[in-house]
From Swiss-Prot:
Residue positions where Phosphothreonine is found in the record: T11
GO cellular component, one term: hemoglobin complex
Annotated PANTHER family: HEMOGLOBIN FAMILY MEMBER, HEMOGLOBIN SUBUNIT BETA
Source organism of this protein record: Bubalus bubalis
Binding site for heme b: H62, H91
Gene: HBB
Matching CDD domains: Hb-beta-like
Modified residues (N6-acetyllysine): K58, K81
One Pfam short name: Globin
Described purpose of this protein according to its UniProt entry: Involved in oxygen transport from the lung to the various peripheral tissues.
Stated name of the protein: Hemoglobin subunit beta
GO terms for biological process, alphabetical: hydrogen peroxide catabolic process
Length: 145
């Protein structure tokens, strides 16, 4: 998946990420750009407009929770399937989330990182993070196979 150099680069960069801010924005953008994903968050209240979604405290809180789990995965890049096994089971068996949504969220996360970090988020880092989010999406979809 990742070389030792790529792991070092993404891990060092991830230390700069404010998961509360980035997580809320990434989940919010997912819900706005792919509105069918909102069906999993009906209990979150008003998701009727982009502003409502982006300012919804439950979206922000869940986005932080998602990125807290992602942060845990960043500590276990060599065992993403093991790290995300319980979440894969939850999302497959209980929540019935389409595993394609994990890929969508990963791609949105990369866009949000680029927005927050600008030129510091180099093309090389972007490529490395694309590998990470693909690995996480694959690990989360593992239970579906």
């Amino acid at each position: 998946m990742l070389t030792a150099e790529e792991k070092a680069a993404v891990t060092a960069f991830w230390g700069k990420v404010h998961v509360d801010e980035v997580g809320g924005e990434a989940l919010g953008r997912l819900l706005v750009v792919y509105p069918w994903t909102q069906r999993f968050f009906e209990s979150f209240g008003d998701l009727s407009t982009a502003d409502a979604v982006m300012n919804n405290p439950k979206v922000k809180a869940h986005g932080k929770k998602v990125l807290d789990s992602f942060s845990n995965g960043m500590k276990h890049l060599d065992d993403l399937k093991g790290t995300f096994a319980a979440l894969s089971e939850l999302h497959c068996d209980k929540l019935h989330v389409d595993p394609e949504n994990f890929k969508l969220l990963g791609n949105v996360l990369v866009v949000v990182l680029a927005r927050h970090f600008g030129k510091e988020f180099t093309p090389v880092l972007q490529a490395d993070f694309q590998k990470v989010v693909a690995g996480v999406a694959n690990a989360l979809a593992h239970r579906y196979h």
